[in-house]
Amino acid sequence: AANDLLGGLSTSRLNLNIREAKGWAYGVQSLASLVQQQLPFLLFAPVQTDRTGDALAAIAADMAAFGTTRPIDSAERNKVVENGVRSLPGEFENAGSVLTSIERNAVFGRPDDYQATLAARYKALTTADLNRAALQLTDGAMVWIVVGDRKLVEPQLAKLKLPVEVRTAP
């Protein structure tokens, strides 16, 4: 749910900033992929080449503020809970999605009635719960992968004083 607020929804903080406020990208999207013992976090932001450095700095600032200096508030909590609950019926629209939920229950050791409890679990989320989750998403252990015209992008990255490793396309 915290990821939805950061970059998982079209109304997420990152999308509203980079796309709507600044106009540097068609969209920003993030996802936290649940696998056993890990939670890989991916963020995609195809931005204008001339704004690569600015966008990277803005995204890093938004992520640093997420759950800390700009914590998730009750309005955001209500939005993500409502979205989560309303999206539940769509998660079981076909046999494949039902099978996927059964498989995930087995993989993660969940009870067979886990899906029946999801609406209540969403509704029980507090802003404190979401802010704790936000800190896990944005703990700073990030690897940034930037793809673009090196002549145009590298000087922008140099201004950010981030370590850069250049790999050329095969």
Mark where each language-model region is.
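His/Glu-based metal-binding/catalytic segments typifying zinc-dependent metallopeptidases
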Residues: A1-T11
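M16 family metallopeptidases and their MPP-like homologs
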Residues: N3-D4, N15-T68, S74-T127, D139-V147
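Generic marker of residues within folded, mature protein domains
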Residues: G8, S33-V35, A134
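Generic non-transmembrane alpha-helix signal with a bias for helix starts/N-cap capping motifs
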Residues: T11-S12, R150
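Proteolytic maturation boundary segments
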Residues: T127-P170
